[in-house]
């Protein structure tokens, strides 16, 4: 029965394509509809598709949940291989030990494979020594800048005496000569001119005759 119906369908499809009255899509849809009706009628109206049953992919899942508590495991997407782990350890060791160069007093000192911890301690020690040296220098400069208190009055007295002496000399030079001294100075100048400027013939004006 099924073989004869299929042959009839093929013949009908060939006839329709030869006739060319409809498109291929419409013809195919009509044939498929007719085929489904025939098979549904032969199966007693129940349809030709089998019953769908749900298949449990997780076999024994319920039993496992009842017997043991829930255990979650993390999946390692990027596993670390032995080679990569070794490389990272070697790099860490290399970074921890490096070359240390010290410039001190015009000389250069180089240490190979110097630990990082020791370098940090050395830097701290150098910083503390620099701070103490700077404090000592500042204290010495402050002490040198402060004058000695006992010497201050003596220095002031000496400078005051020098100032008074200079002031006295200026006052003496600036004062005009009295009339008697002016006359004596003029007479001495005339005597010098008359005597031809001989120094041994000059008369001392201070002598009293």
UniProtKB/Swiss-Prot annotation:
Location of region: Disordered: 175-209
Organism taxonomic ancestry: Eukaryota, Viridiplantae, Streptophyta, Embryophyta, Tracheophyta
Record PTM: Ubiquitinated. Targeted for degradation by the SCF(COI1) E3 ubiquitin ligase-proteasome pathway during jasmonate signaling.
Main location: nucleus
Composition bias, Basic and acidic residues: 179-196
Motif (Nuclear localization signal): 155-162
Annotated ranges, domain Tify: 93-128
Sections of the chain in a coiled coil: none
Official protein name in the record: Protein TIFY 11c
Gene Ontology cellular component list: nucleus
Keyword GTP-binding applies: no
Subcellular location, record wording: Nucleus
Domain commentary: The jas domain (153-177) is required for interaction with COI1.
Subunit text: Interacts with BHLH148. Interacts with COI1A, COI1B and COI2 in a coronatine-dependent manner. Coronatine is an analog of jasmonoyl isoleucine (JA-Ile). Interacts with RSS3.
SMART domains: TIFY (SM00979)
Induction comment: By methyl jasmonate (MeJA), and drought and salt stresses. Induced by wounding.
Record's keyword terms, sorted: Jasmonic acid signaling pathway, Nucleus, Transcription, Transcription regulation, Ubl conjugation
UniProt record, GO biological process: regulation of defense response; regulation of jasmonic acid mediated signaling pathway; response to wounding
Family the UniProt entry places it in: Belongs to the TIFY/JAZ family.
Entry function: Repressor of jasmonate responses.
Motif (Jas): 153-177
